[in-house]
Amino acid sequence: MPYSTNKELILGIMVGTAGISLLLLWYHKVRKPGIAMKLPEFLSLGNTFNSITLQDEIHDDQGTTVIFQERQLQILEKLNELLTNMEELKEEIRFLKEAIPKLEEYIQDELGGKITVHKISPQHRARKRRLPTIQSSATSNSSEEAESEGGYITANTDTEEQSFPVPKAFNTRVEELNLDVLLQKVDHLRMSESGKSESFELLRDHKEKFRDEIEFMWRFARAYGDMYELSTNTQEKKHYANIGKTLSERAINRAPMNGHCHLWYAVLCGYVSEFEGLQNKINYGHLFKEHLDIAIKLLPEEPFLYYLKGRYCYTVSKLSWIEKKMAATLFGKIPSSTVQEALHNFLKAEELCPGYSNPNYMYLAKCYTDLEENQNALKFCNLALLLPTVTKEDKEAQKEMQKIMTSLKR
């Protein structure tokens, strides 16, 4: 409604109100004394007027009836405010109507929808055909969502891809690989930070073909863990953690004696716990420890497992008394460990793979610092300086060791 029309409407209301007032004055002059006339109450218009009512009448010294014109002005102001709000709402609706048609084009562009058909694999063509049927973006952490993303129930698969697409460069032509070549390629790609996203996309492009292969399943779950680490958005991290956990749980059910399935289930339980309350954190902590121990029995020569076990022990050793008490109240037992136990696991990782990682050296330095063995702490800080800094975790570990070295040299 144009602003000029608003003005005309308000002016009309004011003229009408003035006319009613004159009519009332005329009526009171000709009516019999003592007869009162009541004005009807205004009906509530939602909560806008807060049930504003007109008082019946009052008389001045000469007995002349005076209508509460202030009330009338308040009502007019409310009407004007309502009309203004309606105009703003109409403007917002108009904006949305213009924006919505562009949304599909934007999404398809982000997903590589402008790539010509002859350059897209059959898997991608099927994916693009389903895109117009998508009506909403699924971001819940339900198991159904995870099954969909993993390729085991495909109804919502494209919705997930639409929610958190990987860079467009990886949505180009898909190279069909056999299982052995695919596994070798994704293992090689994830050795670098930049290759992890490509590794994830490569696995996702082959999920329909190798969905029932155990070696594929646990690597796909691992890739979701990689995407969790790479993401900086909380909702994306939660999305990747929950789907990865469900995929790794399914892998365990299919292959309970495969240590990698237990390893990545433990890791993803740890990631999921970051978004939970205290009770669920403790519950996931028990799951982490349980499946990590199983994985160590099945893969006794895997240094990563001992590094994770060391981190668990170190974290538990640092729990406050109140945190341990709450855990005992909720679960009937207190998680317990010591710095010495953590140190043992970190040393085991170093024994299996000398120079295993910057973070492992950092925790070795922390353990020795806590045990007041400063020379050993400095030794591992210096060894860490010889290692390349590749990942974000490496960089954070280097910064922490610089702090440790500074504090030890004081």
From Swiss-Prot:
As for subcellular location, the record says:
Membrane; Cytoplasm; Cytoplasm, Cytoskeleton, Spindle; Cytoplasm, Cytoskeleton, Spindle pole
Indicate whether Phosphoprotein appears among the record's keywords.
yes
Keyword entries, A-Z: Coiled coil, Cytoplasm, Cytoskeleton, Membrane, Microtubule, Phosphoprotein, Transmembrane, Transmembrane helix
- Does Coiled coil appear among the keywords? yes
Q: Name one GO molecular function term.
A: microtubule binding
Residue segments, region Disordered? 122-164
Look up the coiled coil feature and give its residue ranges.
68-110
Using the record's annotations, give every residue carrying the modification Phosphotyrosine: 152
User: What is the topology of this protein in the membrane according to its UniProt annotation?
Assistant: Single-pass membrane protein
Q: Which residues carry this modification: Phosphothreonine?
A: 139, 154, 157
- Phosphoserine carried by residues: 51, 121
- Which GO CC annotations does the UniProt entry carry? cytoplasm; cytosol; Golgi apparatus; membrane; mitochondrion; mitotic spindle; mitotic spindle pole; spindle microtubule
User: Which segments cross the bilayer?
Assistant: 9-28
Q: Which family does it belong to?
A: Belongs to the RMDN family.
Specify the protein name.
Regulator of microtubule dynamics protein 2
Q: Which organism is it from?
A: Homo sapiens
Encoding gene, per UniProt annotation: RMDN2
